[in-house]
Amino acid sequence: MIIKPRVRGFICVTTHPVGCEANVKEQIDYVTSHGPIANGPKKVLVIGASTGYGLAARISAAFGSGADTLGVFFERAGSETKPGTAGWYNSAAFEKFAAEKGLYARSINGDAFSDKVKQVTIDTIKQDLGKVDLVVYSLAAPRRTHPKTGETISSTLKPVGKAVTFRGLDTDKEVIREVSLEPATQEEIDGTVAVMGGEDWQMWIDALDEAGVLADGAKTTAFTYLGEQITHDIYWNGSIGEAKKDLDKKVLSIRDKLAAHGGDARVSVLKAVVTQASSAIPMMPLYLSLLFKVMKEQGTHEGCIEQVYGLLKDSLYGATPHVDEEGRLRADYKELDPQVQGKVVAMWDKVTNENLYEMTDFAGYKTEFLRLFGFEIAGVDYDADVNPDVKIPGIIDTTV
């Protein structure tokens, strides 16, 4: 079939398998052209491995460090008449390119929050890898079925303690509008912490440790975003921020556990990028459109692969890691440069419907958004007939 982008709200409901493969290849080429990661990981588990930062971590480990990788994700395959999810196609492409390099790459499809998927992962590590020396935790999910209670909990994107009104960008209608959000209830805050906080990361590490599949010196990292003043009301000081603060608490006990075997655990702070998760946050499209404009002008613009490859090379496995006073690894320092933030803040209230494309890089934002789904990739013929039914050989599918 011929597949064109169809966008509804902050999701593109179509995906392009050939475009997704080309996007993965671009990221692999970036890593191989920037050289190996010295003393990098060799056997890696990535939880949330199919898109965005998790996919970038899998690519960086495999093609920057020659690592065997096991990826966990929750995606949907395509059929002859309907495209699958972008994450499915990304993972199929990743495994294809890894196999060409002689690297082990296997994937588990299912609910990473569940005990079942944790057990299947442990069994697969024992059978195929023995032990892992890096665990990357990169889940972004709107809800979680708690494995101990069976309760399904939802996360909420709301301010805490006060109602907030801020400028947003309606990406469908391409207009600036005021957005008002009521404060989260305590139940909504607790739910967001349960879904997006550190409990599941801790459950994963506990399960892996008890099963004896963590190598001596094993490291783990979970990805987070902090942002600057302009996003704080809705992000760091909001319900999501409460979940991110929970990561900072949970990492301490995880670090103690791994330190007993010479290992380490860190929260890694990454810059704002276009992802399916960030497009759902009302102020992020406007913030990102302004940020892209400023950072591209300064020559410091980065996407997922540049961020994560740099994180592994410079901080997780580097001699002089960027660490803040909380012990987090920082890869977001170019975004938080006072000059960059100052320019974004200065332009924030000046953007109008009329000057949107001049004042901001909304065009770049839209391109990045479509690239998530395999569109707007250079060299891909979008008028060609493609088969949406792409197989992942050897996938362990716990959803069937």
Swiss-Prot record:
Keyword annotations: Fatty acid biosynthesis, Fatty acid metabolism, Lipid biosynthesis, Lipid metabolism, NAD, Oxidoreductase
Residues binding NAD(+): 48-53, 74-75, 111-112, 139-140, 244, 273-275
Enzyme class at the top of the EC tree: oxidoreductase
GO MF, one example: trans-2-enoyl-CoA reductase (NADH) activity
Pathway the protein takes part in: Lipid metabolism; fatty acid biosynthesis
Active-site residues, record numbering mapped to chain: 235
Record's function text: Involved in the final reduction of the elongation cycle of fatty acid synthesis (FAS II). Catalyzes the reduction of a carbon-carbon double bond in an enoyl moiety that is covalently linked to an acyl carrier protein (ACP).
Record protein name field: Enoyl-[acyl-carrier-protein] reductase [NADH]
UniProt organism field: Burkholderia ambifaria (strain ATCC BAA-244 / DSM 16087 / CCUG 44356 / LMG 19182 / AMMD)
Gene name, Swiss-Prot/TrEMBL: fabV
